[in-house]
Amino acid sequence: VIIGTHPHTVQPVEWLTGKGGNKTLCVYSLGNLISSQLYMKLVIEDILTFDIVKSAEGGKITIENVEAHPVVCHFETDETGPVDGLDFALRHSIRLYRLEDYTEELCAVHGAHLAYGTYKKKSEAFTVASLWDYFRAAAGAEFVKK
């Protein structure tokens, strides 16, 4: 299994096939997990689960039951509240939610809407459906069970 990191965004999960026909699970990036960064693609994360199985005969090791579990790093801001030195609204109430449990009500108060003080980013829909669409496109739908 290869687990990459750093780009702050969910990246594809795929099987790579070696010269000898062996399969390796490759996860290019799981995202940030916990952050208060400002855009949808930076607050949707991947918790990947899988089983490492060693056969009784021959000791062959395989990776099975791979599942991608999207989570949202939720935070809130106060529209008229304090800002930091870069004029970003201060964030609070940071929590992780499984995307399957995330609601439109939570989307409506997510701090990404108010991240630049009074400026509201309108170019990116921040809805449960758009979070699912982004996650499936970024990670690949193969391992998303819902």
At which residue positions do the language-model features occur?
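Conserved beta-sheet core of the metallophosphoesterase superfamily
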Residues: 1-48
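A short C-terminal boundary segment appended to hydrolase-like catalytic domains
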Residues: 43, 47-146
